[in-house]
Amino acid sequence: MDFGFTDDQREIQRTARDLLAGRATPARVREHAEARTIDAPLWHELSELGWAGIAVAEQYGGQGLGQIELSILCEELGRALAPVPFLPSAMAATVIEHGGSPALCERWLPGLASGESIGALGAAVDGAAELVIGAPDAQVIVLVEGDGSARVLAAEEAELTPIESIDPTRSAASVSAAGAGEELPDGCAGLGRALVSVSSELVGVCDRALSMTVDYVKDRKQFGVPVGSFQAVSHRCAQMLLETEQARSTAAFAAWTADADPERLAEAAAMAKAAASDAGREVTAAAIQMHGGIGFTWEADVHWLFKRGQLDAALLGGAGRHRARIAAILADRAGAPALG
């Protein structure tokens, strides 16, 4: 097991970071967030580069790469807060490809891989999901139940009610399948990969929040010295770093597991999402506080990271749910009854 990127993976990371630095500037993110629109030109450009289908099999028009490469893009897009439907569409494609029938894959994956179609994925109870990010812009929606079963339906088959989530960089809706669509033969097969993707995006969000905070406390002065020189501030920044790196390590391990040891993915993905959800909530909240009064203003860009972090932390279950999942897996392995 080697967590170091290959030369090709480092090139994907470098290219993505450089491109997004110029295309997903804070001003552009703010413009689309305030209008609650996706950045259609940027989405088209990313699709032309093959990003939309980076982990989709070549037979369906994708790049045929793995979860590690997909996670690299998720992290960079999370760092940039790019207002594009990459994450929900990638998660939907993952669940369809790894759990769907050949007919379902043939129907939906070519469009998702090319970016011509947009996907969305949400956690549902009895066919209804209260929050599905990207659903208003989607052509295909995947609803995953708590027992791991899943249903795929065309957007026009679903009952959609657009809602405003905490994160205005993303569209969202409540969705009801109302018995429409088609059951996936194995809904659990791709769910672990979807969890890894959202965990990786949270790593990017936390890393950016940490970077912005450290830069701010080095420049902001009080009593004639940078506030970052005060022990309470430096210790809080150190804690933010620890939480971010824990999320990064578990997400990296889960991405590697998805490609190299998929039998262990359920456990690794739950670990990644639990750590990333904790970090997403704590690191972005700390970033707001460490920016002081300016952190609470609309003009400060740090609040966009807070909103993305809080939303992603809840997607497909928060830290508590995934810790319970880890406990159940370990109890089953030991032959003991799970708690709760």
Name these PLM-found stretches.
Residues 1-80, 115, 192-340:
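Alpha-helical interface subdomain recognition
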Residues 80-88:
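Short, flexible active-site-proximal loops enriched in glycine and acidic residues
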Residues 82, 94, 102-215, 225, ...:
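FAD-binding core of flavoproteins
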Residues 91-100, 328:
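Helix-loop "lid/cap" segments that line or gate small-molecule binding pockets
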Residues 31-33, 74-75, 97-101, 121-123, ...:
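A short linear-motif detector with a strong N-terminal bias
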